[in-house]
Amino acid sequence: MAAVGVGGSTAAAGAGAVSSGALEPGSTTAAHRRLKYISLAVLVVQNASLILSIRYARTLPGDRFFATTAVVMAEVLKGLTCLLLLFAQKRGNVKHLVLFLHEAVLVQYVDTLKLAVPSLIYTLQNNLQYVAISNLPAATFQVTYQLKILTTALFSVLMLNRSLSRLQWASLLLLFTGVAIVQAQQAGGSGPRPLDQNPGAGLAAVVASCLSSGFAGVYFEKILKGSSGSVWLRNLQLGLFGTALGLVGLWWAEGTAVASQGFFFGYTPAVWGVVLNQAFGGLLVAVVVKYADNILKGFATSLSIVLSTVASIRLFGFHLDPLFALGAGLVIGAVYLYSLPRGAVKAIASASASGPCIHQQPPGQPPPPQLSSRGDLTTEPFLPKSVLVK
C-alpha cells in the first residue's frame, strides 16, 4: 500500500509530499482551517479504508483473487495517473511530454536506475501486506504496522545522520511496547480462528513490510534530495519499475495459476475498490499533506486505528479485550508524541519548569522561532517525507 499506505505508492508519494508553500499571512484562516479538517478526514479514511477493504476482499467467500495481479494493476493505474498529471503540466503538448520523458527517463538513466531499488522493495512490501492482512485481523494489523515509524526513524538515523529527541526515543519505546502487547494478546487469544489464517505468518509479513517500508522511504528521500525531478515523475518511474517487477513476481509465485484461470480471476467490485485505493490513495495523500502538519498526520493515524478497530468489530466480529485496548492505546499515544514538533516540546518543558512569564528579547539577539503562517511550529524535517501515515 505502499502506497506505499499502505504500500509502495503511498510511501513513494509520501516521500515527495513535502509541504510546498504556506497561505499568505493575510489570507483567511477559516479557509485554511477547513482545509486542515478536510485533510484530516481524507487521511483517516484512506488509512483505515485500505486495510479494511483488503481484509474484506480477502475474506469474502468464493473465488479468491490473486494478490500479485492486484499489485500489478495498482502500479499500472498509478503510473498512468502520473503520466496524465505530467501531460497536464505540459499543457497537453504531446511533443513536449515525449521530449521531457526521453530526457528524464532515458538520457538521465542513472537517476532512473536508482529508483529500481525502492521500487523492488515497494513491490515486495505490497505483496507482504496482502499476506499479513489475510492472516491477521484488520485492527491487529493496523496497530502492528505502526512499527514502520520505528524502522523509518532508525534508518533515518543510520542513513541520513538524523538525531531524535529524548521524547521521540521514549515514544518509540512506547510504540514497541504497545505492539508487543497487541501481539501477545493475538497469540494468547482463545476465540475462534479461521483455519486458513496463520497469525505467525501474518506477524512475519508485517515485520518484513515495516522494515522494507522504513528503508525504502528513507532511500527514496535521499534520491529526492539529490535530484530535481518532480514527485509525479518519480512516481511514474516507480510505477514503470513496479509494473515490471510485479509481473516478474506474478510469474514466479502464481504464473501457472494465472495462466490457467486468467489475470482477473476472482475480481469483484470489492477487489477493484482495493486496487483503486492502492493506486490513488498514496497520490491523494501526497496532495493532501500540503495542508497537513506532523501533529495532524499523527492524529490521523491514531483516529484510523480507532476507526479500523470499531469497523472490525462491526464487520468481522473482532473481539476487543482490555489487553488489546491497552496496547492500542500505547501505540496511539506513541504516534502522537512522536509527531510533536521539537519547538512545542521545548516550549512545554520550559513553561512547566519556569511557569508563565513574559519573555523580553535581549538586544542584539536573534528573535525566537515564530509560528509559521500555516500556524505550525517547526517540525521534524524527515517525518513528512519518510513516514507516511497509513
Swiss-Prot record:
Residues 9-22 have a biased composition (Low complexity). Pfam families: Nuc_sug_transp. The chain crosses the membrane at residues 3-23, 37-57, 65-85, 97-117, 140-160, 169-189, 200-220, 238-258, 269-289, 315-335. It is found in: Golgi apparatus membrane. GO terms for molecular function: antiporter activity; UDP-galactose transmembrane transporter activity. One of its GO terms (cellular component) is Golgi membrane. One of its GO terms (biological process) is UDP-galactose transmembrane transport. PANTHER family: NUCLEOTIDE-SUGAR TRANSMEMBRANE TRANSPORTER. This is UDP-galactose translocator. The lineage of its organism: Eukaryota, Metazoa, Chordata, Craniata, Vertebrata.
